[in-house]
Amino acid sequence: MNTTVLSTLIGRTLSDNENVIEQGYGGSSQTTAGCFIKTQTVNSICNGTVVSVERDAITNTWCVTVWVNSQQWVRYCYLSSVKVITGTTISMNDSIGYAYKNLMKFEYCTSAKSKFPVRVSNQQLYKHDPTPILSGQLKLSEVI
């Protein structure tokens, strides 16, 4: 796992062999293509524009969607509070908000179809396994 990406996301340096990805989760179909990550603070792992800040009526948590480029978006979900608003341009390491009960969900979306559709504002996106991004195998400038 690429500790640089994860350290940026959680806002601190990981200690040797520390695993912040919640066991039993991961980027697979069982979690609708997202990784749950143990953290208090949530920081941006890339530059982009906040296109959506939505509140989930069931969990009463926030989800922030960031447009990275014409084909890629990242979502930071299960946030108890957020520090950004729609239209904000953010940079890598900028604070997004705080995780709900020290657990947030990171999602990677593109316009390429998958079995996990998600509607963001008026756009249909599709979730994909975020593990390659978190591991450093896939850069956000590359498209799956």
Stretches found by the model and what they are:
Residues 1-63, 91-92, 101, 131-144:
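Surface-exposed, glycine-biased beta-strand/turn segments
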Residues 22, 77, 107:
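Residues in well-ordered beta-strands of folded domains
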Residues 38, 43, 53, 68-95, ...:
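Short histidine-centered loop motifs in beta-beta connectors
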Residues 88-144:
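Conserved, short, structured surface segments that act as functional micro-motifs
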